[in-house]
Amino acid sequence: MAYRIHGPRKTVLFVPDIDRWDAPSVGPEFIESLFDGVDVAYVDATFYDGREIPGRNLLMIPHPAMIDSMELFAEHVKRKPGSIRFIHLNHTNPALHNPSVIEEVEGRGFLIARPEERTKL
């Protein structure tokens, strides 16, 4: 599920819950078009890499890993650093509380959305 919200000055993409980026209905062209013309994107990042939920197969949980999303969107954030902000982080996700993980995420050009963050449209 994704919503594109257009305002007079900015466009926001809101992807609060997605099963996977490599689903048959989602291809590279679709993903690129999804972000085309978007100023800020808020993207599902429930789990970081799956290690935070030992004993569970991340492939069986319908959420893309944050590290996979960062790899997929690496070229986009090179062009527009800070334009993708991660939301919907599970309480076990180290990007919520581990400074070195947060630094890695931000160093790759992504941000973790702040509570009550707003984007003026």
Task: Enumerate the language-model features and the residues they cover.
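Short Fe-S-cluster ligation motifs
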Residues: 121
